């Protein structure tokens, strides 16, 4: 306990008050001082005096040790020592047959023997009430003693201690714990205020106690891992929880089948996670319990799940031969293992699942690079799992040189740009030559920038490989311009001009003839009209 205490210099005689009690000859008894204020265990001198004129017997009644220091005919001076608590010493006299007395008030002050903040809980949940308990032992006068509860330097509560100094007192105060209280120091301080008596304010402070708070979400840790584990694979097990505090104090771990696999945990500001990589082997039980456990403060949050371990081999897809010549027979077979069944084999009509499916085909050129697909299914824990296998067939066949691969007739205009396509195909890829029958000139396959008359002719294309050969004729016709053609080209426009002129002249002639006929008819009509109007002779 840390404490501060001053040694006060207190006047032992503070006041003089006389108590008068009538007696023979108006005798009076008095006590001095009437009030005294001193530290516990201290001493004070008390004077008892009387105005009695007759036979006088004077004394002091007290519970403390007393020594008579001096005396006179009608007074005595006593010293009281080791005064432990508040008391009222009494001066008394026997004056003749009359008794009288006077009392004083002694007030004792003392510092608390101990000030202690009761131990705090190991962990306090955020949002819950935290009761601080300050235990005060001793201290007087209690009317001037108070207890202060602190969070760091912040005053949370100040309360009077009260009660009898000999009785220990507990002062309580309730606060609502928050995240900000994590790591905060709480303490209790007593304050003995003797300033009204001309002294100072004396304080004792308890040892500080540190508080740890925690907060947990309403959810449980989240497991992110498949329910099914396949033998021969590596599976990632992951568990996490968000919204907790303080995440740095939390511990999270994974437990698989009662064993803790090698794992790595991560703590961030308000979340934690655990990750484990597990090699699934045949030694594993078919069902394994998986637990994710989070520990924070005195709380444990847990998530459980049951994992199923299975062994599922891919189906075995075989071809009797991966490479065959055209026309050969090929057997395609798919076999399932580990309790699985074949549900699909390309080339076979759908049928009920069975452990094995096969069929035979005659290989043709269309089957070259044909993919065969096989799928097997396995039911595990009510779920259907699928695995597939694919194989490719290679068929050897002779060269092909059809109309679509190489046109038989080509007609080009001399001087134009053309592209000639002629390509044989087969497996293995055939070689091909195209030569003109007349002189063996090569067929211009590809891009021809300027067609020439000399390219005209009949060409023979021959494609061959280790699996056969094929021949195809290609006719190339080149249209070109001769000198007679130029004469025709010149004469045609001239003739067209002459014909046009003749037609124009005929049109003008016919028009003039029609006009003359029209005028003649008009003249005849006018003559007949005049003749009808003449008077008879």
Curated annotation (Swiss-Prot):
It is found in: Membrane. It is a single-pass type I membrane protein. Disulfide bonds join 48-91, 52-95, 134-188, 239-292, 334-374, 406-422, 422-461, 434-461. It comes from the Eukaryota. Residues 41-102, 127-195, 232-299, 327-381, 415-468 form the Ig-like C2-type domain. Residues 28-485 are extracellular. Residues 510-537 are cytoplasmic. ICAM proteins are ligands for the leukocyte adhesion protein LFA-1 (integrin alpha-L/beta-2). During leukocyte trans-endothelial migration, ICAM1 engagement promotes the assembly of endothelial apical cups through ARHGEF26/SGEF and RHOG activation. Homodimer. Interacts with MUC1 and promotes cell aggregation in epithelial cells. Interacts with ARHGEF26/SGEF. Interacts (on T cell side) with CD81, CD247 and CD9 at immunological synapses between antigen-presenting cells and T cells. This is Intercellular adhesion molecule 1. It comes from Mus musculus (Mouse). The lineage of its organism: Eukaryota, Metazoa, Chordata, Craniata, Vertebrata. The gene is Icam1.
